[in-house]
Amino acid sequence: MEIAVIVLLLLGGVMIYNHVYRKKMYSEIDRLEAWKISIMNRPVPDELSKVKQLNMTGETEQLFEKWRQKWDDLVAVKLPDVEEKLFDTEELLDKYRYAKAKAVLREIDQLLRQAEEEVQLIIDEVHELIGSEEQNRTEIEELRTMYREAKKTLLAYRYTFGVAAAKLDEKLEEIESKFKQFEELTASGNYLAAREIVLSSKGELNKVTEMMSDIPELLTECQTTIPAQLEELYDGYKEMKQEGYILDHLQIDREIVQKREKIEQCMQMIGDLQIEEAKQGITEIKEEIDTLYDLLEKEVISHHYIKTEMSRIEEMLNELNEEAKETSEETLFVQQSYRLSTKDLEKYRSIEKQIHQLMKRFEIIQARILEAKTAHSLLKEELEQLLAQIEMMKEEHEEFRKMLQTLRKDELVAREKLDEMKKKLSEAMRLVQKSRLPGLPKSYELQLSEAKDSLMKVAVRLEEKPLNMSAVHQALEESGNMVQRVYERTVEMIEQASLVEKVIQYGNRYRRRYPSVKEGLEEAEFLFRHYDYEQALEQAVAALEKVEPGALQRIQQIFRDERSKEE
């Protein structure tokens, strides 16, 4: 019973699926049928009838026949074939050959897609042809108007076009011949070819119109403006030479000849209607003329600079030379009291030598100015370099003078430092006396003696004539380090001695109970009486820490508290 139910359900499912699938396939057939009908109803015949209104010869006739044949082939062959395939699909569905039917439907879809593209191509090409004819009629009239205006302008103002007039005539004649060619192509039905003529004529005419706009101005530049600039430049050049300017290095004569040759080349370019090349050439000529003007102006500015700066530079040099002489005398005087390093002496000799060289260079420039054979711009550059070196020498010379002045200041500072170190050493000795130590370690006495000797060496260095400040500074540094070490050790030694006493006093409470403490404290006392305070402290602390760990920290705190109260 259950099996029968399952079989019935399966059969029912198959029947439902079969029904739904067949319905879907028939819907696809209906869609393709509607598509086929829409293609057949496209207005191709109407579009082709518009073509018949044109001149049905030549290219137009050939295109019309091509389009008509394609349409006839679609209507008579390809679309009926589609219709037949649709019927075949229905028969396949009736026989439940769904896979085959689906393949045929895909084929029909592809055929209709191709047919749609062919129809659209026919319509687009027809529109292009008809549109070309309409555009041609409109644009050719505009071009004829432009042509007549250009012809009229060339005739009325021919003199303004000069050498280019003949070539412009030729260009306009070429355009006129294209108009005739356009008429012939249109009459023979070759509208697309005629369209190409319209486009090329439009480009040529626009180009000619632009040339006619530029040529008069370019000719004015070549025939009037630039020659006038060259004359003005040459007159200025001659006037400057008469005033004594040295201008041979600019080669103005040769430059002007070259510019005139370039003008002739530009005129030839204009005559050949190479307008862009002529524009570029004229621009280059004008830039080169501006450069020549700039060079002449540079000579004028340089002349003014020399005229105004020579006396100032001479005054600066003389002032520097006088200061150097004073510094030389000051150096000799300083050397009586201070010993200058070889490096410092070499530096000063170098400064003297360079100042002498600067004086010689200035004299040479003066002579060249009087000789009047060197361009002012070159002399100006040399003077600027000389001025920069004078400024540099002034700085170096000032640094050397400051160094001499610093020597005396350094001596005073060194004497002050010596006094400070003596006071510091005396303070250390006062602290020792105040502490009432039983005695001093041999190593400390030796260190103290060395510090005193080092202070004596500094004092001796400061009394030398001439005074060697480099040696003084070295002796000061060594002595300062020694005094500082003595002072630090003094403070440390006094603190250790005081702390030993505190530790022993604190540890006395354990003497009777702990023999080890008694023994350790006795050893510490022995070391203390022999002035070894550091070892005494270590011995006392070691003995005490065995019975009371952390005792040292507590004693140190007590020690610090007592010192704070005393202060």
From Swiss-Prot:
Topology in membrane: Single-pass membrane protein
Residues on Cytoplasmic side: 22-567
Q: Which UniProt keywords apply?
A: Cell cycle, Cell division, Cell membrane, Coiled coil, Membrane, Septation, Transmembrane, Transmembrane helix
- List locations, semicolon-separated: Cell membrane
InterPro entries in UniProt: EzrA
Task: Tell me the protein family, please.
Answer: Belongs to the EzrA family.
Name of this chain's protein: Septation ring formation regulator EzrA
